[in-house]
From Swiss-Prot:
Catalytic activity: an N-acyl-L-alpha-aminoacyl-tRNA + H2O = an N-acyl-L-amino acid + a tRNA + H(+)
InterPro entries for this protein: Pept_tRNA_hydro (IPR001328), Pept_tRNA_hydro_CS (IPR018171), Pept_tRNA_hydro_sf (IPR036416)
UniProt GO BP: protein quality control for misfolded or incompletely synthesized proteins; rescue of stalled ribosome
EC code(s) of this entry: 3.1.1.29
GO cellular component, one term: cytoplasm
Family classification: Belongs to the PTH family.
NCBIfam families: pth
Protein name: Peptidyl-tRNA hydrolase
Organism: Serratia proteamaculans (strain 568)
Positions of the record's site feature: Stabilizes the basic form of H active site to accept a proton: D95
Domain of life according to the entry: Bacteria
Length: 196
């Protein structure tokens, strides 16, 4: 079993970004809150929207930073320090270019894959990358020069449906992570692929 005390959904703040691919991590946290009848509330000392859940008998905090993506670490560190949460008790959900829509993967540790939100969290924790990552596939535009416009764009309805289905499965697998650990979660989540 894994001891997760903080689940973070990376996003850019503001209505103009709410439906963009880069906010997929926040979509996942929003779904977790909804499933447990909780409302995310803005808490300025944590630079984000927060909620508290009982997940499979565990006391878990949710956080969607209201900083811009490249300053996400400020919010995560503030909450981790306040509640004395270690990096390996944190799950960070984020959009992933290298995974197609309809697929989500989870891992512990690893690099940042050029993701500015992950980069900032790593630097704020003294480059200790040993936190869990939920990588929500958004696909790749095929040209690295188009990446910024792609992640800040809205997916078409067909892709959105697949991303939503992968997030739904990831939300179900979150409890498996807490009760049965990473290996079982990987087996189930990594075998899921939403149908177009």
């Amino acid at each position: 079993m894994s001891s997760i005390k903080l689940i973070v959904g990376l996003a850019n703040p503001g209505a103009e970004y709410a439906q963009t691919r880069h906010n997929a991590g926040a979509w996942y946290v929003d779904l977790l809150a909804q499933r447990h009848n909780q409302q995310l509330k803005e808490e300025s000392k944590f630079y984000g929207y927060t909620a508290r859940l009982n997940l499979a008998g565990n006391d878990v905090r949710l956080l969607v930073p209201t900083t811009f993506m490249n300053l996400s670490g400020k919010a995560v560190l503030a909450m981790a320090n306040f509640y004395r949460i270690e990096p390996d008790e944190i799950l960070v959900a984020h959009d992933e270019l290298d995974i197609p829509p309809g697929v989500a993967k989870i891992k512990l540790g690893g690099g940042n894959g050029g993701h500015n939100g992950l980069k900032d969290i790593q630097s704020k924790f003294g480059n200790n990358p040993n936190f869990y990552r939920l990588r929500i596939g958004i696909g790749h535009p095929g040209d690295k020069n188009k990446v910024v416009g792609f992640v800040l764009g809205k997916p078409p309805a067909s892709e959105q449906k697949m991303i939503d289905e992968a997030i739904d499965e990831a939300a179900r697998c979150t409890e498996i992570l807490l009760t049965d650990g990473l290996e079982k979660t990987v087996r189930r989540l990594h075998s899921f692929k939403a149908q177009a």
